[in-house]
Amino acid sequence: MQIHIHRHRIREITCDGTLSIDGQHICDTAEHSQYRPLVGNYRIVLRHNRAYGRKVPTLERIDSAKPSKPAVLAIGNGIYNRHDGRIILGTYLIPGCLKWSREPFKQLYDRINNSQRRGNEVMLRITESRQ
């Protein structure tokens, strides 16, 4: 399964984008500009996260020898106090803020989980618009 995050609005603090799977728009994304994952290709694995107390989609960088801090796809409404590289999912409200985050996250989690149980690899590609 190929997941694509395209960042289209990058400001001093906020970074907004869209998430699509195999070319179909799924939801919007928000990240903190200073702590966002680097542009590139990642493998998504489900790992236990102590902060959430459950398995969450975690990004593993595959196209660079330089290690980056592991980021996760997460539930949330805003990125202003997040300094851990989380990418939150939902419906765009204003720059850096999303609404209705739980349902898109649950759908994405289920798709990733089902794909991995079938033995398929889940890949994520992050791109940015030139600004």
Named regions from a protein language model:
Residues 1-123, 127-131:
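Cell wall/extracellular polymer interaction/catalysis modules
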